[in-house]
Amino acid sequence: MPKVRTKDLIEQFQLELVSGEEGIHRPIDTSDLSRPGIEMAGFFTYYPADRVQLLGKTELTFFDTLTTEQKQERMKALCTEETPCIIVTRNQDVPDELLQASRESGVPLLRSAQTTTRLSSRLTNYLEGKLAPTTAVHGVLVDIYGVGVLITGQSGVGKSETALELVKRGHRLVADDSVEIRQEDEDTLVGSSPDLIEHLLEIRGLGIINVMTLFGAGAVRNYKRITLVINLEIWDQKKNYDRLGLDEEKMKIIDTELTKITLPVRPGRNLAVIIEVAAMNFRLKRMGVNAAQQFSERLMSAIELGNQE
């Protein structure tokens, strides 16, 4: 099922439907837009028919210089079965030839009061957000000191309980159990909660609680950029866990790699505090302060000094 249809643009941007009502359910599959200036001159060899077409003052001013026959020919070529819609900006008068071509082909013809540049920018941002690659991950997403931390792990390991403790300590819950993730850019992942379980937290033995009702609006967020993954796993005595922090694990979600930290879970460990510190330490690393690297350098200096003596 298409993520975006022409009718969504009409509703989102309050566009006037001039003609082509039967085509408002046409799918929009790309965030790229087209301003068919060269097409107005008759060059349709590389015409991107599957894009939203914007006709601004420049295009329509040139269009007025054409003969009646050329006008009819260009507008018929502009309206194809693939074209999701044509938008005339600045509330300009719609040419009769375009109106006729729209009625014959069923291509929705829309009009906006906004300038072409402004509308183009808003449309691109909207479509990129809606058409971005998406996935869902089992885990909890919490905003800790401005760092979007995705907490993962097997069911029953204590993710939700840890998130509850973090919320009590002043941090903000984004999603529990299922985190919907969309890739808005090459290195930007944004997580949010499904509408059905938004602001809800499931605690075994207690049931489902509404975090916003219990702790207030300041305890929740609707979405957050994910920059750190913390994986909780039951402590394995046979496994060697990182004790210095020099080696950095990575986890790939869609096409983006994120820093991953594995935390072993066993009685007596305060996971909420450890995750808080992990988030703060991650921020420090991004600011150029790496405690593990500093310790390693001190150790090497001490060894070299000892060898000289």
UniProtKB/Swiss-Prot annotation:
Keywords: ATP-binding, Carbohydrate metabolism, Kinase, Magnesium, Metal-binding, Multifunctional enzyme, Nucleotide-binding, Serine/threonine-protein kinase, Transferase. Residues 201-210 are annotated as: Important for the catalytic mechanism of both phosphorylation and dephosphorylation. GO terms for molecular function: ATP binding; magnesium ion binding; phosphorelay sensor kinase activity; protein serine/threonine kinase activity; protein serine/threonine/tyrosine kinase activity. It is an enzyme of class 2 (transferase). The active site is at 138, 159, 177 (proton acceptor), 243. ATP binds at residues 153-160. InterPro entries: HPr(Ser)_kin/Pase, Hpr_kin/Pase_C, Hpr_kin/Pase_Hpr_N, P-loop_NTPase, Ser_kin/Pase_Hpr-like_N_sf. It catalyses: [HPr protein]-L-serine + ATP = [HPr protein]-O-phospho-L-serine + ADP + H(+); [HPr protein]-O-phospho-L-serine + phosphate + H(+) = [HPr protein]-L-serine + diphosphate. GO terms for biological process: regulation of carbohydrate metabolic process. Residues 264-269 are annotated as: Important for the catalytic mechanism of dephosphorylation. Its EC number is 2.7.11.-, 2.7.4.-. The keyword Flavoprotein does not apply. Mg(2+) binds at residues 160, 202. Its cofactor is Mg(2+). Belongs to the HPrK/P family. Homohexamer. Both phosphorylation and phosphorolysis are carried out by the same active site and suggest a common mechanism for both reactions. HAMAP family: HPr_kinase. Catalyzes the ATP- as well as the pyrophosphate-dependent phosphorylation of a specific serine residue in HPr, a phosphocarrier protein of the phosphoenolpyruvate-dependent sugar phosphotransferase system (PTS). HprK/P also catalyzes the pyrophosphate-producing, inorganic phosphate-dependent dephosphorylation (phosphorolysis) of seryl-phosphorylated HPr (P-Ser-HPr). The Walker A ATP-binding motif also binds Pi and PPi. This is HPr kinase/phosphorylase. It comes from Bacillus mycoides (strain KBAB4) (Bacillus weihenstephanensis). The lineage of its organism: Bacteria, Bacillati, Bacillota, Bacilli, Bacillales. The gene is hprK.
